[in-house]
């Protein structure tokens, strides 16, 4: 099981699982890549029992992603590379190793990843009713 749900503390490792394995991931839809190629790899360390909170490590090749209606709230801690985020009003912030940021659900703008970008992430998806 690659996502722990037991009632134990889990150490986050920058290279993924304890054996250093990171698997292909596909968070970025091809039609949202505005520049470059999004080759994603990562590892999920934790998913809660409701399935709406996930914690992992994620890396991506240099590219620019368009965010139309970001699907979840997300907190990121940058491990490597650079992330430049521009919101729909044109405000830009740049994050490098050691920085952390939060993306709210519904965000509209662009994410530009420079270098082999890598971060830890926590996502919280909206709870589904009924």
Per-range role (PLM):
Residues 1-52:
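A short, N-terminal "cap"/entry segment at the start of jelly-roll beta-barrel domains
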Residues 43, 47, 51-70, 104-105:
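Conserved short histidine dyad/triad with adjacent acidic residue
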Residues 60, 70-85:
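Short, conserved beta-strand element in jelly-roll/cupin
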Residues 63, 73, 80, 86-88, 90, 112, ...:
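A generic structural motif
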Residues 67, 85, 119-121:
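Short hydrophobic/aromatic-rich beta-strand segments that constitute the beta-sheet cores
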Residues 89-105:
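Short acidic-glycine-tyrosine-enriched beta hairpin
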Residues 105-129:
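Ligand-binding loop in jelly-roll beta-barrel domains
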